[in-house]
From Swiss-Prot:
NADP(+) binds at G130, A131, G132, G133, A134, L227, G250. Gene3D superfamilies: Leucine Dehydrogenase, chain A, domain 1, NAD(P)-binding Rossmann-like Domain. It catalyses: shikimate + NADP(+) = 3-dehydroshikimate + NADPH + H(+). The keyword Oxidoreductase applies. The lineage of its organism: Bacteria, Bacillati, Bacillota, Clostridia, Eubacteriales. Shikimate binds at S20, L21, S22, T67, N92, D107, Y229. Involved in the biosynthesis of the chorismate, which leads to the biosynthesis of aromatic amino acids. Catalyzes the reversible NADPH linked reduction of 3-dehydroshikimate (DHSA) to yield shikimate (SA). The keyword Membrane does not apply. Belongs to the shikimate dehydrogenase family. Pathway: Metabolic intermediate biosynthesis; chorismate biosynthesis; chorismate from D-erythrose 4-phosphate and phosphoenolpyruvate: step 4/7. This is Shikimate dehydrogenase (NADP(+)). PANTHER family: BIFUNCTIONAL 3-DEHYDROQUINATE DEHYDRATASE_SHIKIMATE DEHYDROGENASE, CHLOROPLASTIC (PTHR21089:SF1), SHIKIMATE DEHYDROGENASE (PTHR21089). One of its GO terms (molecular function) is shikimate 3-dehydrogenase (NADP+) activity. The active site is at K71 (proton acceptor). It comes from Syntrophomonas wolfei subsp. wolfei (strain DSM 2245B / Goettingen).
Length: 290
């Protein structure tokens, strides 16, 4: 569909964005849906962030996705937050409602929908590698599903402790914090029903890295999940598969988040299978350009 004066604007703000697949996924999906919209990648330097709300209103953007490092920093500039965004203290979708900017967070729901799509039961005890913003959203969602115990491992113990306290204060689940090291991971992984890598270790271009070793995973019966989707098969998941463990990559969560974004901004359900196909094909091209 040709661009014209009626073309509606959407986009992604963050820094850096050169490896993001969101513009490709959203633009092809919008075309598939027959909508006169365009989705732009907007690299914003930190000092320019306060100018974004007025730009959204002036240019009449329908909405934006928000990624690192602005998920928390954008909040003071918004007019309203969804319950999830307020609870998590982070926003990844902004909807422009006639100049009224409403912030949402779809991270946790995206992960839960991905689990359901794969038929994975998270069980009773979740172990998190990393205690940043992604871990916060996913942990809160799992607590809502009834996961009774959540353990957080991080190289920054104070960050893990803060997240554990946050979950304990807002749910009936028991949450604990530990300093990330081999012995603690091995001990906790033996009783975990699901282990989730919420760290960037293993993400493109450092695809040969894993937050833990094969020996660390030996003896665990947990489902392994990686929030990384580039590459589709992270080193962490490969090690688990070598030991016969069930695994789930971050593609489903990424696509579900994208679908939820379009539902929020457009009020329509997008073609989920098509969105996944677009991203998967692009990632496979990166692995094998021929």
């Amino acid at each position: 569909m040709p661009l014209d004066i009626k073309t509606e604007l959407m986009g992604l703000i963050g820094y850096p964005l050169q490896h993001s697949l969101s513009p490709l996924m959203h633009n092809l999906t919008l075309k598939k849906m027959g909508l006169n919209c365009i989705y732009l990648a907007l690299e914003i330097e930190e000092g320019k962030l306060p100018e974004i709300p007025s730009a959204i209103r002036t240019l009449n953007f329908r909405g934006l996705n928000v990624t690192i490092p602005y998920k928390e920093k954008i909040i003071p500039f918004l007019d309203e937050l969804s319950p999830e965004a307020a609870a998590f203290g982070a926003v990844n979708v902004i909807k422009n409602k006639n100049g009224h900017l409403h912030g949402y967070n779809t991270d946790g729901r995206g992960f839960v929908e991905a689990l359901r799509e794969e038929g994975i039961d998270p069980g009773e005890r979740a172990l998190f590698i990393g205690a940043g913003g992604a871990a916060r959203s996913v942990a809160f969602a799992l607590a809502g599903l009834g996961v009774s115990r959540l353990d957080f491992l991080d190289l920054d113990f104070s960050r893990a402790r803060q997240l554990a306290e946050f979950i304990t204060s807002r749910s009936s689940s028991l949450a604990s914090a530990f300093l990330m090291n081999t012995l603690e991971f091995q001990r906790l992984s033996r009783t975990a029903s699901i282990i989730i890598n919420c760290s960037p270790v293993g993400m493109f271009p450092d695809t040969g890295k894993s937050p833990v070793s094969k020996e660390d995973l030996r003896g665990s019966r947990a489902v392994l999940c990686d929030l990384i989707y580039n590459p589709l098969q992270s080193r962490f998941l490969s090690l688990g598969q070598e030991l016969g463990l069930e695994t789930m990559n971050g593609l489903g969560m990424f696509v579900q988040q994208g679908a939820l974004t379009l539902e929020i901004l457009l009020g329509q359900k997008p073609p989920l299978d098509y969105m996944k196909e677009v991203v998967q094909n692009q990632l496979e091209k990166r692995v094998d350009p021929d």
